[in-house]
Amino acid sequence: MDKRISIAIDGPAAAGKSTVAKVVAKKLSYVYIDTGAMYRTITYAALEQKVDIENEEQLMEVVKNVKIEFQQGENTQLVFLNGQDVSEVIRTPEVTNRVSIVAKHRLVREEMVRRQQELAEKGGVVMDGRDIGTHVLPDAEVKIFMLASVEERAERRHLENMNKGFDSNLEQLKEEIAQRDKLDSEREVSPLKKADDALELDTTSLSIEEVVQKIMSIVSGVFAK
């Protein structure tokens, strides 16, 4: 396994991309890049600065002054905004419900994609998001598109929220996830879309271990070539 490849994992909100991507990266001793966390960090910074997130010009001022870094913690990846650990605060419902609005802006996405490509240029990365296989890493050797029903994804997010001590309403989550799907797939710039050469993986009735196993066997096939 000397060959260091790029692995792109795309899919809608709460499909389990990050959880699976982290495990795959760990198994391969690869770098995991959570592109969603990058957009969340920008969203958090904009909200903190009371910026109008519909205003692209104002958002770009925030982006220019934001340095995002990833560090491997004991059991998880830590996200830093200008040196401050924001790993937890970027996962609050307040940020979650606004991140698709921030991510729809062309200039914001262009800058984020530039940074993501820079992080991945040497290979040996597992990157997850909405447009990795289609736009960020179109030449990735492995492309996965993860799917799950809205109900299943809402259940997962509900459990995640409860475990983190956030207030959580399952029915409201179903509505919010459906709304994010709509925003993500209908936006003009890099919409949520399966790459033509991506393998579709419906995770609705699969455990994390089963999904990881499927991806690892796909990766093994690439290494064997």
From Swiss-Prot:
Which GO molecular-function terms appear in the entry? ATP binding; CMP kinase activity; dCMP kinase activity
Where can this protein be found?
A: Cytoplasm
| A Pfam family | Cytidylate_kin
Residues annotated to bind ATP = 11-19
PANTHER family (alphabetical) = CYTIDYLATE KINASE, CYTIDYLATE KINASE/PANTOATE-BETA-ALANINE LIGASE
InterPro entries assigned: Cytidylate_kin, Cytidylate_kinase_dom, P-loop_NTPase
| EC number(s) reported in the record | 2.7.4.25
Main enzyme class: transferase
Sorted alphabetically, the keyword list is:
ATP-binding, Cytoplasm, Kinase, Nucleotide-binding, Transferase
This protein's source sits in the domain of life called Bacteria
GO cellular component terms? cytosol
Q: Which CDD domains match?
A: CMPK
Q: Which family does it belong to?
A: Belongs to the cytidylate kinase family. Type 1 subfamily.
Protein's name in the database: Cytidylate kinase
UniProt GO BP: nucleobase-containing small molecule interconversion; pyrimidine nucleotide metabolic process
Q: Which gene encodes it?
A: cmk
Catalytic activity entry: CMP + ATP = CDP + ADP; dCMP + ATP = dCDP + ADP
